[in-house]
Design a protein with these regions (language model features):
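Metal-dependent catalytic cores of enzymes that make or break cyclic nucleotides
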Residues: 403-412
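Conserved small/polar residues in nucleotide/adenosyl-binding loops
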Residues: 415-421
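Inter-helical turn/loop segments and adjacent helix faces that build the functional surface
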Residues: 236-237, 374-384
């Protein structure tokens, strides 16, 4: 029997980045379990993913399963049959458990004791007849934090499924799902090479995708992004901040990532860099750029999934987006500076810390008491003790400022950013 590669692709609308990563990590194991459960031998399994597709591929999948004969020893014959030779409950239960008829049980002598045996024969089956159900079940078994239905369909998936590709060697596996039947065509990059594109065999799918502007693995897309960022850093003399969490999301937002440089008005540099960086990283998935001395530059990196020919338009659109976000940040920061931090402390009464422990204002009083006790134990007096008490009093004031309400990852540093100016 010839062994062939089996490749299955689920083509979709853009999948959520973190959910896609989680599904990618589990898909290989799920596929292996499904093949093993059906008695289908296979070689190495590979998983590929982009925002618009999940692909799983297994090497060395045979055309047919092997014919199998299994022999199972059961209870002693004197227990399995009564005096008249009729099967007892023990024999009936054993036969039922092994999937054979009690009349087919055999008696065999073993060291002077007669036992009953069940011989179970499983014929060879063409693998391509088993695969449609296996692959359909694989689709429905993928876990998504949130799923949706589309059109008039009852099936659900993380995002609408638009095409299916399934081939074993050069034979199409007719998997059906959500009104679609798998074929031998795939789609390339949505804008650069949409397709559809004919694929000659299961082995050829990944090469066809690469030829049509699809980078099929997270690792390759991340390497491409980092290489492009390094080239920009060398050209500009600036340094990019590439947090792992943001990078993990960005690699699953583009099938063919192109890194571009955007710019914002220098007036936003007056806003604490923590707020500006938060606005870019957390809210827009832009990578900030810093000068060699560590100060924030008025430039940022865009990871685009669009056509590089339209870079000017893409950059302009993203600059408009970041400008709107930074105008908001500057507005909230400027408004926060109009009042001393002490004014915000009393508003902490509106923030519940924990139902049984009261508000954050009550927590502030406890922090102040702790600060006094620690200062006294440390022998602090005069200005040192007063500074400790004041720091404790203001520690949570930033939680009700406009900037922190709008940019929720900022509070760890926002108090010290505003303190020199407005207190």
């Amino acid at each position: 029997m010839a062994n062939q590669t089996l490749t299955f692709e689920i083509g979709t609308e853009e999948l959520p980045a973190f959910a896609l990563h989680a599904a990618t990590e589990k898909l290989g194991g799920m596929f292996a379990d499904a093949l093993d459960g059906a008695g289908i031998p296979h070689g190495e399994i590979s998983v590929y993913s982009t925002p618009r597709r999940l692909i799983v591929s297994a090497l060395a999948v045979p055309e047919a399963t092997e014919a199998l004969t299994e022999t199972f020893r059961g209870p002693a014959a004197k227990i399995a049959f009564d005096a008249d030779g009729n099967p007892t409950k023990a024999a009936l239960g054993f036969a039922r458990g092994k999937g054979v008829d009690a009349s087919a049980l055999e008696r065999r002598d073993e060291n002077g004791v007669e036992y009953v045996y069940a011989v179970k024969s499983t014929p060879s089956v063409q693998v391509i007849t088993l695969l449609p159900d296996i692959l359909q079940n694989l689709i429905t078994s993928i876990y998504w934090p949130r799923s949706q239905r589309w059109g008039s369909r009852h099936e659900h998936f993380s995002r609408p499924v638009r095409w299916l590709f399934a081939m074993h060697g050069d034979a199409v596996v007719p998997v059906e799902f959500a009104g679609l039947t798998a074929g031998s065509t795939t789609c390339g990059h949505r804008f650069l090479a949409p397709g559809p594109w004919e694929v000659a065999s299961a082995d050829a799918l990944i090469d066809v995708l690469r030829e049509h502007n699809v980078v099929p693995t997270e690792a390759e897309r991340e390497a491409s992004i980092r290489e492009q960022v390094a080239a920009i850093e060398e050209k500009t003399g600036l340094v990019a901040e590439l947090p792992a969490k943001t990078m993990a999301e960005v690699v699953n937002l583009a099938e063919f990532p192109t890194v571009m440089v955007g710019e914002f008005d220098e007036l936003f540099l007056a806003v604490p860099k923590e707020i500006t960086v938060d606005a870019m990283l957390v809210h827009q998935r832009y990578f900030p750029l810093f000068n060699a001395d560590g100060t924030l530059a008025n430039k940022f990196l865009i990871t685009s999934n669009g056509d590089p020919k339209f870079e000017a338009n893409i950059v302009d659109g993203n600059q408009r987006v970041v400008a709107a976000r930074l105008y908001d940040a500057k507005f909230f920061y400027d408004e926060d500076l109009k009042r001393p931090l002490e004014d915000y402390v009393e508003r902490l009464d509106t923030v519940v810390f924990q139902e049984k422990l009261g508000t954050t204002r009550a927590k502030t009083d406890r922090i102040v008491a702790l600060a006094k006790a620690i200062a006294a134990d440390a022998g602090a007096t005069g200005q040192e003790a007063a500074d400790a008490e004041r720091a404790a009093y203001l520690a949570k004031a930033d939680l009700v400022t406009g900037a922190v309400v709008e940019f929720t990852s900022v509070p760890v540093s926002y108090t010290h950013l505003t303190l020199p100016t407005n207190s």
